[in-house]
């Protein structure tokens, strides 16, 4: 069956790189949402917790439950807040009005992305609702919209963020609250700005990538995951024979072809014409592709960024397309 290889050596290298930039592994929260960017959330969580990471960020409550044994501090970005051991991101005032007493919350502040988050002029109202419902403010954060782009917008938005922090500090004094944890930097922002907050939320860099322009001199990270497929069968295809759905590929000469057990249900795009190990013959099927030759296994990609550029997308999309049903094998 198709499977994913994961390099522990690459993971250690990436973690050392981001830890050095952040000022220590204690200032890193590993972003493990969406099945750890396709790497397999439980296995990846186990590895990275053993390497010293204490904080994790996930998308849902279900993801948090899967890794609860590995991290003492877990932030959930997109789920209904509960009064339990997890911390929950709050994006609007409506959610604050229905919190259970004791719920641990991180207020997300909209500093310019305008996707979600509490508006700057709503911050004090948010504090009033926190007090009213006796929720626990444990964090305040934002998200940068252009950290990996060749522009100065990151600096403008970071100025907004500094203003937010000052306002929050004034409000915690007013309401006699403990100082929350501040966090804003993602992978790209960490390498451009460093980390002056309590921690940075690091996702894509742990997996071996940034989308930073070369002018920013991005760090030398190593891809953790590679996607592989195994041979199902080989056959001789005669000159003039056509193969696959629609018969869109026609052999120009006699050739040996092989079927491999990865298709568009396994992380390959249906429109894809080639993989790292060669050209795809005909159309991609749901569960298989055809290549010339008879290798026992083939590499779909070992560098998601390089492959993504050929496909007109970004490394993130290729990685999260690796489905959960694929087995994941750690090497090194």
From Swiss-Prot:
Substrate binds at residues 115, 286. The modification N6-(pyridoxal phosphate)lysine is found at residue 33. The active site is at 33 (proton acceptor), 245 (proton acceptor). Its cofactor is pyridoxal 5'-phosphate. It catalyses: L-alanine = D-alanine. The keyword Isomerase applies. It comes from the Bacteria. Its EC number is 5.1.1.1. This is Alanine racemase. It comes from Nitratiruptor sp. (strain SB155-2). The gene is alr.
């Amino acid at each position: 069956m198709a499977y994913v290889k994961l390099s522990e050596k690459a993971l250690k290298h990436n973690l050392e790189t981001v830890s050095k930039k952040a000022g220590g592994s204690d200032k890193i929260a590993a972003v493990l949402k969406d099945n750890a960017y396709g790497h397999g959330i439980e296995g990846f969580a186990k590895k990275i917790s053993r390497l010293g990471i204490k904080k994790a960020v996930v998308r849902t409550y279900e993801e948090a439950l899967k890794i609860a044994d590995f991290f003492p501090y877990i932030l959930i970005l997109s789920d209904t807040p509960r009064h339990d051991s997890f911390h929950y991101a709050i994006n609007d005032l409506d959610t604050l009005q229905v919190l259970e007493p004791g719920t641990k919350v991180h207020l997300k502040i909209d500093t310019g992305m305008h996707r979600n988050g509490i508006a700057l002029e709503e911050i004090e109202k948010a504090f009033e609702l926190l007090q009213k419902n006796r929720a626990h403010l444990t964090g305040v954060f934002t998200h940068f919209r252009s950290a990996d782009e060749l522009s100065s917008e990151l600096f403008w938005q970071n100025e907004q963020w500094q203003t937010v922090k000052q306002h929050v500090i004034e409000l915690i004094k007013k309401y006699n609250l403990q100082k929350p944890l501040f966090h804003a930097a993602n992978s790209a922002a960490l390498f451009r700005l460093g980390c002056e907050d309590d921690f940075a939320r690091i996702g894509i860099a742990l997996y071996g990538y940034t989308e930073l322009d070369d002018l920013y001199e991005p760090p030398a990270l190593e891809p953790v995951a590679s996607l592989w497929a195994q041979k199902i069968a080989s056959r001789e295809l005669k000159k003039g024979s056509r193969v696959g759905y629609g018969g869109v590929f026609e052999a120009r000469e006699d050739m040996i072809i092989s079927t491999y057990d990865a298709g568009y249900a396994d992380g390959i795009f249906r429109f894809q014409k080639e993989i790292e190990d060669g050209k795809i013959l005909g159309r991609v099927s749901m569960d298989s592709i055809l290549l010339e030759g008879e290798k026992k296994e083939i590499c779909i990609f070992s560098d998601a960024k390089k492959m993504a550029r050929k496909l007109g997308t970004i490394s993130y999309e290729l990685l999260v397309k690796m489905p959960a049903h694929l087995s994941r094998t750690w090497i090194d």
